[in-house]
């Protein structure tokens, strides 16, 4: 028994001695890449010239233009035809000229890369992490990651370092672990052990997240309210023209209060880092973001624009009315350094999807794509399946007469004995 137990250990030790350099060479290269980015990020408030570093020459970005539906098209807001925007294809030549004039005038409100993020002034809004008085700091160990996850974390850390959103930190009293969640694509059907076809979503990759649960547990909660969706939709309905805008990495535009930055520290295979800008995963981040947007668009909300998190819907009763409103909203964005994601902004369209509902001059309608998804849902076989079906169908209960009566047989199944 002793010889059987010792043999694998000896073999493993011999293998490591012979292949140690090969096993760790790739990991060393990854860590070296991270370290190369760190010197210039230690003082991100200084220009790179002041740090003795020659900035690399900036190249014009190249964008992969995805196919658009027939009612949308790409146009460019610069003479070199580098920076595209998405507008309605139904505009007349005169209307398109007027719209492009406004978009060129407010070019600074549109973001194309992370470098375009200037950061909203802390005087307007900054995120605070107020900890309960009797709470003790928590330092968690890093978690094991498979090679694919490590590559995702490495790329994300590099990207955030280069953008100045995170910085290395060595002495934080709060440390949270990194983990990766799967990004799921379309639905496919696979057989189970009983040869029954079960729909499943295909994992197409991974996304890096920070597990802030220990920090969130001892954080004082912010109860800033979100707008009522039904009231927003009513104000948007029956309008003729819309501009649907979206914040560019919205959370990353809000600064974390200086004394609270160490509480955002995370650990990964490449070191420990803290956030200068607000990360996803903090319990009060959505409330902070909604408060910030409400402050930025004060005087405009419920009058010319509807704001729900980082989705902004500018509307008007005519083209000229909507264009005038868009001019004021983009001007406010530039004044406050709020940057919009060009790829998710649609200008001067006659209809669009807002929070799962189709809005147009006709009023409020269901999103047909979501209805088809509900139709394809499998027959529920357990409590979880019943809740899923009721949740999806209940989203459109305003369009279904006597929904509570129709769904009662399913809701009865959820009652405890």
Show where each model-derived region lies.
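Reverse-transcriptase-like RNA-dependent polymerase core
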Residues: 62-70, 75-80, 115-138, 181-209, ...
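Inter-domain linker/hinge segments that demarcate the starts of reverse transcriptase
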Residues: 32, 62, 73, 94-114, ...
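Acidic, serine/threonine/proline- and glycine-enriched intrinsically disordered segments
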Residues: 255, 263, 285, 318-323, ...
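C-terminal reverse transcriptase regions that engage the nucleic-acid substrate
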Residues: 104-107, 111, 220, 237, ...
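Short coil/turn segments at secondary-structure boundaries
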Residues: 46, 84-87, 112-123, 167-173, ...
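Short beta-strand-to-loop capping motifs
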Residues: 89, 314-317
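An acidic, Ser/Thr-enriched, charge-mixed low-complexity segment/SLiM signal
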Residues: 1-169, 191, 198, 235, ...
């Amino acid at each position: 028994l002793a010889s059987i137990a010792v043999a694998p250990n000896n073999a493993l030790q011999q293998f490591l001695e012979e292949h140690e350099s090969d096993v760790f060479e790739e990991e060393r290269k990854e860590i070296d890449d991270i370290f190369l980015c760190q010197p210039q990020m230690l003082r991100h408030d200084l220009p790179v010239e002041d740090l003795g570093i020659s900035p690399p020459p900036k190249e014009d970005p190249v964008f992969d233009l995805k196919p658009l539906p027939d009612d949308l098209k790409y146009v460019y807001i610069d003479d070199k035809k580098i920076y595209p925007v998405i507008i309605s294809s139904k505009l007349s030549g005169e209307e398109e000229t007027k719209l492009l004039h406004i978009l060129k005038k407010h070019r600074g409100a549109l973001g194309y890369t992370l470098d375009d993020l200037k950061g909203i002034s802390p005087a307007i809004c900054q995120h605070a992490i107020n900890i309960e008085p009797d709470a003790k700091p928590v330092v968690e160990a890093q978690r094991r990651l498979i090679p694919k996850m490590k590559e995702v974390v490495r790329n994300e850390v590099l990207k955030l370092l280069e953008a100045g959103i995170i910085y290395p930190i060595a002495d934080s009293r709060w440390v949270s672990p990194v983990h990766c969640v799967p990004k799921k694509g379309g639905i496919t059907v696979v057989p189970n052990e009983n040869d029954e076809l079960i729909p499943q979503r295909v994992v197409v990759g991974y996304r890096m997240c920070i597990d802030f649960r220990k920090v969130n547990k001892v954080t004082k909660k912010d109860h800033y309210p979100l707008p009522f969706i039904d009231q927003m939709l009513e104000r948007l309905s029956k309008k003729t023209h819309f501009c649907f805008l979206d914040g560019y990495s919205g959370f990353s535009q809000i600064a974390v209060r200086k004394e609270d930055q160490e509480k955002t520290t995370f650990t990964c295979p490449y070191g420990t880092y803290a956030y200068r800008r607000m990360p996803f995963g903090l319990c009060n981040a959505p409330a902070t973001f909604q408060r910030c947007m409400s402050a930025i668009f004060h005087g405009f909300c419920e009058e010319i624009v509807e704001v729900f998190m980082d989705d902004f819907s500018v509307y008007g009763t005519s083209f000229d009315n909507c264009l005038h409103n868009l001019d004021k909203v983009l001007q406010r964005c530039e004044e406050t350094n709020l940057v919009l994601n060009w790829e998710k902004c649609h200008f001067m369209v006659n209809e669009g999807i807002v929070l799962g509902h189709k809005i147009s001059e006709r009023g409020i309608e269901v999103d047909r794509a979501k209805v088809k998804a509900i139709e394809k849902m499998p027959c529920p076989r357990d409590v979880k399946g019943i809740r899923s079906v009721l949740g999806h169908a209940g989203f459109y209960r305003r369009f279904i007469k006597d929904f509570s009566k129709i769904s009662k047989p399913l809701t009865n199944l959820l009652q405890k004995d």
